[in-house]
Amino acid sequence: LFNEDNELIKKKIENLNNKIMILLCVGESKEENKKGITKDILKDQLEVIKNLDLDESFTVAYEPVWAIGSGLTPEPKDINEIHKYIKDVVQSNSVNNLLPSVLYGGSVTDKNAGSFFNEEFVDGALVGGASLDGSTFAKIVNIFNKTKEL
């Protein structure tokens, strides 16, 4: 979006770590998804955290670019698999073996949130357009709370 390379993103994370909650958004394009190289793309994007001592508030949002605002979402089992992969990559690459929270963002609505909130490795959602309507956003929050039994 801003044409930031991994080196610049890594410097930003290093400078902001322990000062604010960092939310790193990663995701693949429709073409990359169709080619079956999603994990390769995510691994490359997650290189920015290699050898960093991450704060426990560090969070990753998986946002498949092809799903944002499209009304399309991956299957819940696929979202879960990708979230597990992201957690594994971050944990193995950070100095302190941090197991991050991973949020899903990509056409999140009150109609589909429950399907992926039920998945083991989905820790929450990064809600875009649906957050503009307070009642819809409240429904998503309630679905999350019921699903995750907070």
Regions found by a protein language model. Give the residues of each.
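Active-site loop-to-helix "anion-binding N-cap" substructures in soluble metabolic enzymes
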Residues: 1-150
